[in-house]
């Protein structure tokens, strides 16, 4: 797939099933994440690969996070079932360090760029994905499960697998004009 076509036609796939990326495919995805823009080569991220029985553990963590937040039964059930939306999930944590030249927000953005790079690498290999976040990224229970320190941030959960719905061949690519000013 042509890189420009991939970027211009990017879209999320919310219904994902087996097979998930494995072996070299998964390594390609992780390597793409490692090449995200990164001021001062700080590599301010950590990737947690969740698959197989790890999804059961992740389910328990999300359920406990929802309970601790005082969520209603419907939200708790949704949290518990979230890891089963896809056969593979990569949780990305921005591991931020104090640096007077690279502020925390920039390190968080680098980790976010890593998520997009990994999603694009998955799509380039024939898989689909969706980047999810939400209130549980801030949950003390979930943060603890991923070893987050006070300065760290869970930037999202990247769900990956084989798309179950065929994407529309006609994509309405927005006109960038209203969003651009030539200065």
Swiss-Prot record:
GO terms for cellular component: cytosol. It comes from the Bacteria. The gene is ydjA. Belongs to the nitroreductase family. Its EC number is 1.-.-.-. The keyword Transmembrane helix does not apply. NAD(+) binds at residues 121-126. InterPro entries: NAD(P)H_nitroreductase (IPR052530), Nitroreductase (IPR029479), Nitroreductase-like (IPR000415), YdjA-like (IPR026021). Binds 1 FMN per subunit. Its cofactor is FMN. Signal peptide: none annotated. SUPFAM superfamilies: FMN-dependent nitroreductase-like (SSF55469). FMN binds at residues 10-12, 35, 39, 131-133. Disulfide bonds: none annotated. Homodimer. One of its GO terms (molecular function) is FMN binding. CDD domains: YdjA-like. It holds the Pfam family Nitroreductase. It comes from Escherichia coli (strain K12). The keyword Ribosomal protein does not apply. This is Putative NAD(P)H nitroreductase YdjA.
